[in-house]
A protein has these predicted regions:
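Conserved beta-ketoacyl condensing-enzyme motif
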Residues: 22-84, 88-97, 102-104, 110-129, ...
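Active-site pocket-lining segment
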Residues: 260-329
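Active-site pocket-shaping loop/turn-to-helix segments
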Residues: 11-38, 54-55, 77-91, 103, ...
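Conserved catalytic cysteine-centered active-site region
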Residues: 52-102, 143-148, 206-232, 313-340, ...
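Phosphate/pyrophosphate-binding loops at sites that engage ATP/ADP/AMP, CoA/4′-phosphopantetheine
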Residues: 35-46, 156, 160-161, 248-255, ...
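Buried hydrophobic positions in well-ordered alpha/beta secondary-structure cores of metabolic enzymes
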Residues: 7, 45-48, 86, 93, ...
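Active-site-proximal alpha-helical scaffold in enzymes
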Residues: 81-111, 157-187, 240-246, 333-354, ...
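N-terminal extracellular/periplasmic Venus flytrap/periplasmic-binding protein-like
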Residues: 11, 23-32, 166-250, 318-320
């Protein structure tokens, strides 16, 4: 891709489930950040593409766009690749601009686990037990022996021989870097405060090895996955502005980076964390680059096993990896996370003076999504 410019973007503070955004529906949280992006850059996008992971409504992107006060003439598309939805939304937007189908698009995503919908069964469903039969909507229900993300992390640790001793330093590192970034205001220019939020609620500045040693496995019969090496569930929103070179020049928009390539990869759903590495490999192959040519990496560390897998597959990148900490500290608002890590990646490149940056997300079901940018 030579024509796709990354102008910038914004994210909300990231709230805990039941935290500061506990009464805020997903579309309103998304709308607040979406509106802030249009105002910051003084643009009216030609399309909105939004990721959302837990099905907050039919074409929730359209609802968020209308709630943000955007003209009815602007179409909006919702994307569901579970945890990778926000990054896939950006990849889709870049492809549309590269193909000449649009000149300016806002893409990203949002999530409210606090107001996560509940699913009701009708009389034709085998689980129907009367009018009061409800369950929380969940990732990939029913596939592959009901394996969910926690079990996927546990199985990954078992198959890849990852110990808590190997993963604990990554947990400590994530909270330390995130706490330092918050104290320094390193990300303040990409954060918009809304609905009374004043901080990222998941960061624990006092996280310690002593605390980690006391945490039991959260799975019956398990040995690895605990409340610290698995990410929090969260509420949040993030969007980026993409434009063609011609549009950016005509509207005097400063270009911060170019979107160069995107890639997706599928793997074993039972060990879904590995899909982030599969997607990175596919991205590097498509770009014709070695991992040694990438200055900064940003992975959505939903589990510490992802950090360990990355360090084994791409050694020597600790200084340029998740420079401001990752999801083990900030948390993981599913549909927003891809856009969040892209914004953090851009800030990392600027801080370190790097050229190429790669972002990757592993998603429920064993699908990975990755994106390559080049700082201008």
């Amino acid at each position: 891709m030579d024509k796709v410019c990354l102008i910038g973007g914004l994210r909300s503070y990231i709230g805990l489930t039941g935290g500061v955004y506990r009464h805020v529906p997903a579309e309103l949280l998304g709308a607040a950040v979406l509106k802030a992006v249009t105002e910051k850059y003084n643009v009216v996008p030609q399309q909105i593409i939004c990721g959302n992971g837990v099905g907050a409504g039919g074409n929730i992107a359209r609802l968020a766009a209308l709630e943000a006060g955007l003209p009815e003439s602007i179409p909006a598309v919702s994307v569901d690749v579970q945890c990778g939805s926000g990054l896939e939304a950006v990849a889709m937007a870049a492809a549309k601009i590269e193909a000449g189908e649009a000149d300016v698009i806002i893409a990203g995503g949002f999530e409210s686990t606090s107001t996560q919908p509940r699913r009701g069964y009708n009389a034709n469903h085998p689980d129907y037990k009367g009018e009061e039969t409800y369950s929380v909507a969940k990732f990939m229900p029913g596939i592959h022996r009901e394996t969910v993300m926690l079990e996927g992390a546990e199985l990954t640790a078992e198959r890849e021989h990852i110990s808590r001793a190997e993963s604990d330093p990554w947990v400590l590192r994530s909270h330390k870097l995130a706490a330092q970034a918050a104290a320094d205001g390193a990300l303040s220019d990409i954060i918009v405060s809304c609905f009374g939020a004043v901080r990222d609620e998941g960061i624990r500045p006092k996280m310690s090895q002593r605390l980690l040693d006391r945490l039991p496995c959260v799975l019956e019969g398990g040995r690895f996955t605990n409340a610290a090496n698995a990410c929090l569930t969260n509420d949040g929103a993030a969007f980026v502005l993409l434009a063609s070179e011609g549009y950016a020049k005509a509207h005097n928009l400063a270009v911060q980076a170019k979107v160069r390539h995107s890639a997706a990869a599928g793997g074993d759903p039972l060990v879904s964390p590995k899909s982030a590495i599969l997607a990175l490999n596919a991205l590097l192959q498509r770009a014709g680059l070695s991992h040694t040519q990438i200055d900064c990496f940003e992975l959505n560390e939903a589990f510490a096993v992802i950090d360990v897998l990355f360090s084994r597959a791409f050694p020597g990148h600790e200084d340029g990896y998740n420079v401001f900490g990752g999801a083990l500290a900030y948390g993981h608002p599913y549909g927003a996370s891809g856009a969040i890590i892209l914004l953090h990646l851009l800030k990392s490149l600027q801080k370190r003076g790097g050229r190429f940056g790669a972002a990757s997300v592993a998603a429920a079901g064993g699908v990975g999504t990755a994106l390559l940018i080049e700082r201008c």
